[in-house]
Regions:
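C-terminal accessory extensions appended to soluble enzyme cores
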Residues: 289-327
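Amphipathic alpha-helical recognition patches that constitute DNA-binding helices
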Residues: 14, 25, 163, 240, ...
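PAPS-dependent sulfotransferase catalytic core
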Residues: 1-118
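PAPS-dependent sulfotransferase catalytic domain
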Residues: 93-261, 269-282
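Short, well-ordered beta-strand elements within core beta-sheets of diverse protein domains
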Residues: 14-16, 232-237, 293-295
Length: 327
């Protein structure tokens, strides 16, 4: 990464990634910065109300991203109404909870509960403007209808201090993670891929085609906007989270803080079993996170993913399973 020379300026950050690529963890690194207004998966609200491949979806998504980056929520009442009742999205962002939520502790089991008011357009706009930096995390499939070079050029030109980080992960690990949370298929399909060859292969072929297209787009964007668009491997982030976090903050022109360092340290060292669920942002066992797919996927499943996603493996330097060298 090349450090920004404008560390005192306000920054806008867009995190792009495939689902199950570790983007929630990356987002939480920014979310723990006291000067960051962080928004987790805002476009998911549009998928509830709008046909994904329609012109209306494209227009609404572009407008929503522009309004978020410019702290203008007065015209986004429907969006805020949906976000008010989406716990995962809301509680992934400090700025959407702290001004609105009160916690109470139940005496009999010492559990904490939150009571939150609905998000208010004016308060949300003011909260955003009071934070120096705006960070938004979006999964690439929510941008697929219009994620192209022309839109990227327009987005960057209209937001002079916007930079983009494109997070990529070993496709074998992504498939294993998708299986773990049950997003696509039953566990038996992956664990016994040889008995469900057509179903599993069809999905993997589609997945790898999308991932290859996404990587091709990212490589082109990084070459054209090399000071504003960067590709990051998830594995590099979790191997040396403090070092990579510092490099990222330098790239975006955001100062490192004690709060971020504390979060990175805690998330890397925790042994709390409550943080082992599929949506946890704790990263206590690095080797397990990188290589758990080796135990979860059958050899047939691994070979299917590798044959279809080979360009991704080669370009991002992931070693095929037949090698003894770990990725």
């Amino acid at each position: 990464f090349k450090a920004s020379n404008k560390s005192t300026m306000a920054s806008k950050v867009l995190i792009l990634a495939h689902g199950r690529s570790g983007s929630s963890y990356l987002g939480q690194i920014f979310n723990n910065h006291p000067e960051v207004f962080y928004m987790y998966e805002p476009l998911i609200t549009l998928q509830v109300t709008t046909v994904h491949d329609s012109k209306l979806y494209e227009q609404s998504a572009k407008s929503l991203l522009d309004d978020i980056f410019n702290c203008q929520f007065m015209q986004q009442t429907e969006f805020l109404a949906f976000m008010s009742h989406m716990p995962l999205n809301r509680f992934s962002s400090h700025v959407l909870t702290t001004p609105y939520c009160k916690s109470t502790r139940r005496a009999k089991d010492n559990r904490t509960f939150f009571q939150c008011e609905d998000l208010d357009p004016l308060i949300t706009s003011l909260s955003c403007t009071l934070h120096k930096h705006v960070v938004v995390k979006v999964l690439t499939h929510r941008l697929v209808p219009f994620l192209e070079e022309d839109y990227l050029t327009t987005l960057l030109n209209s937001n002079g201090n916007l930079k983009i980080i494109h997070l990529m992960r070993d496709p074998r690990a992504v498939i294993a993670s998708l299986d773990r949370v049950g997003w696509v298929f039953n566990r038996s399909v992956v664990k016994s891929a040889w008995t469900n060859v057509s179903l599993f292969s069809a999905y993997v072929q589609k997945f790898c085609t999308q991932m290859i297209q996404s990587l091709s787009f990212a490589l082109s964007a990084e070459a054209k906007f090399h000071e504003r668009y960067k590709i990051l491997r998830y594995e590099d982030l979790i191997k040396t989270p403090m070092t990579v976090s510092q490099e990222l903050f330098d790239f975006f022109g955001i100062r490192m803080t004690a709060e971020v360092k504390d979060y990175v340290t805690r998330s890397s060292r925790t042994n709390n079993r409550r943080n082992t669920h599929a949506y946890s942002t704790m990263r206590s066992n690095v080797s397990s996170l990188i290589d758990s797919w080796r135990k979860q996927l059958s050899i047939e499943a691994v070979q299917t993913v590798e044959s279809n996603c080979r360009p991704v493996l080669d370009i991002l330097r992931y070693t095929p399973v037949y090698s003894q060298n770990l990725p």
